[in-house]
């Protein structure tokens, strides 16, 4: 039995307040034949003086693989405070199961979420899908995935402006990895989520990442872009992030 631990340390430079309506599980998915995988990331910032800013972020994955079965648990948390006012205290957790069909797979997931930055008290998802490989050679690949999911959201709970939304959505996503040189590669993901009975209501997530590999770690930069065509409360429909960081891989048998 093989065990593997992967530690990620990130430096975060936010362009806007982060919207966590769509979660990219691909970026935390370690490509490994290990039986167990644990991946974690931490980053933070403290500023004092004219402005007092506290920021802390953590993303974690625990994965178990047996034969063609893969079970993954994702837990993410973000906290931002400015002048002792909480701007963000957001969490996302997702339990995901995948069954491999050679280069393809079927999957199911359940997800829970809270996002103060979006006035989102709770968001619960249940979904299934199919992932198809279109191209694969060495580390280069192109996959697409499609599946429906159930969405239950509560905004501004316990207020006169509370909004409770139940949707059924279709999710279409693509996953692309291209090896530029022996040590430099590009990984890009794209998610498109469409409301089943209102095609004017859709969400988009786009994240390209450039990574450079050294002997025992990688450095990278990535841009995260999110868009919701019809927000259900008075918030911005677009947000983005620019991140720089490195990963360190520690493994043992």
What are these regions (language model features)?
Residues 1-33, 251-253:
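Cleavable N-terminal export/targeting peptides
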Residues 30-46, 70:
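Transmembrane beta-strand segments of Gram-negative outer membrane beta-barrel proteins
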Residues 34-36, 52-56, 87-91, 122-126, ...:
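Residues that define the transmembrane beta-barrel architecture of outer-membrane proteins
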Residues 42-44, 73-77, 108-112, 128, ...:
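Transmembrane beta-barrel strands of outer-membrane/channel proteins
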Residues 44, 62-66, 97-99, 132-134, ...:
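Residue-level signature of outer-membrane beta-barrel architecture
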Residues 143-216:
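Outer-membrane beta-barrel transmembrane domain signature
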Residues 212, 238-253:
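Outer-membrane beta-barrel "beta-signal"
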């Amino acid at each position: 039995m093989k065990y593997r631990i992967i530690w990620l340390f990130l430096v975060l430079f936010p362009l806007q307040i982060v919207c966590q309506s769509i979660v990219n599980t691909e970026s935390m998915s370690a490509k490994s034949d290990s039986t167990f995988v644990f991946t974690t990331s931490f980053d933070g910032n403290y500023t004092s003086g004219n402005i007092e800013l506290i920021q802390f972020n953590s993303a974690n994955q625990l994965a178990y693989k047996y034969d063609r079965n893969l079970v993954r648990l994702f837990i993410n948390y973000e906290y931002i405070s400015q002048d002792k006012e909480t701007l963000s205290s957001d969490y996302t957790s997702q339990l995901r199961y995948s069954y491999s069909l050679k280069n393809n797979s079927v999957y199911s997931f359940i997800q829970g979420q809270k996002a103060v930055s979006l006035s989102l008290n709770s968001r619960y998802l249940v979904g299934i899908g199919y992932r198809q490989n279109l191209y694969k050679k060495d580390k280069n690949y192109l996959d697409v995935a499609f599946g429906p999911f159930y969405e239950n959201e509560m905004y501004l709970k316990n207020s006169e402006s509370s909004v409770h939304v139940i949707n059924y959505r279709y999710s279409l996503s693509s996953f692309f990895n291209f090896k530029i040189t022996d040590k430099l590669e590009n990984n890009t993901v794209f998610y498109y989520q469409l409301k089943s009975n209102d095609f004017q209501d859709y969400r988009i997530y786009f994240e390209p990442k450039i990574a450079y590999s050294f002997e025992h770690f990688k450095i990278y930069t990535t841009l995260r872009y999110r868009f919701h065509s019809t927000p259900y409360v008075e918030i911005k429909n677009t947000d983005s992030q620019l991140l720089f960081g490195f990963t360190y891989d520690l493994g043992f048998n």
